[in-house]
């Protein structure tokens, strides 16, 4: 299998980007992402919504912002062993050691903001990405999504998984849980990237555009106890990651209350019906 790499004229660009990479490169972060993976997979009932042929041999799949490669390693079991699976991320520190990876899985370093390898253009039957676009403003989403769409071969599919973290689907009562949306709107450049994604897909001529929207219930009213445990952990992690970066004044509450936010957040999940909306969007490049 051909080894793909991306080089830059100024090597410091990639190093600077790594320094600003949002994810902590350690085992705790890998465990957080694996829990999130299982939560989204279990909630939506699977990994792939695009109607790709799971039995066809010699297909190529690209996973953008692959992190530790969890999605790619999991989806591998759905396809024949001849399937080519490539994942890329800006920082390779989370990648499993090369000797532990299946032969048809390749993890490389590339930067969505700097451009992708020319040999990827029109190459992939499925291009997948999740939990990336909230970090970008609409114009950057347009630029990045354009690069990913170029990687889809004629007749192939792109699939995007994103939260709608800025939308309240829990009602007004769980005021501490609603802090999640306040933090999202404070820190995310696009707390609800759904509409921008759909508009860009339409504008660029992709067809068979579909969206599955799911309000994933968390806490007391989630009947599936495993999904409840995974969802609560994922929400706690999200709030814990954002909370230290904002002051009590920005939250509009006394410091004493701010110190107890995480406990009250947990209590709201146990008392009220709380949920977070996520979407999966998939679309096809015309033949």
From Swiss-Prot:
| GO MF, any single term | methyltransferase activity
Pfam family for this entry, one: Methyltransf_23
Say yes or no: keyword Endoplasmic reticulum present.
Answer: no
What's the superkingdom here? Eukaryota
| GO term, biological process aspect, one | methylation
Task: Summarize what gene deletion causes.
Answer: Completely abolishes the verticillin production.
Read off the InterPro entries from this record. Answer: SAM-dependent_MTases_sf
The induction comment states: Expression is regulated by the cluster-specific regulator verZ.
What UniProt keywords are attached to this protein's entry? Answer: Methyltransferase, S-adenosyl-L-methionine, Transferase
Has UniProt tagged this entry with the keyword Transferase?
A: yes
Top EC class, one word: transferase
EC number(s)?
2.1.1.-
Q: Quote the pathway field.
A: Mycotoxin biosynthesis
Q: Which family does it belong to?
A: Belongs to the methyltransferase superfamily. LaeA methyltransferase family.
Q: What does this protein do?
A: N-methyltransferase; part of the gene cluster that mediates the biosynthesis of 11'-deoxyverticillin A, one of the dimeric epipolythiodioxopiperazines (ETPs) from the verticillin family that act as mycotoxins. 11'-deoxyverticillin A is required for normal conidiation. The nonribosomal peptide synthetase verP is speculated to be responsible for condensation of amino acids to form the carbon skeleton of verticillin, whereas the cluster-specific tailoring enzymes are involved in further modifications leading to the production of 11'-deoxyverticillin A.
Name-wise, this protein is N-methyltransferase verN
Traced from the root, the source organism's taxonomic lineage reads: Eukaryota, Fungi, Dikarya, Ascomycota, Pezizomycotina
UniProt gene name: vern
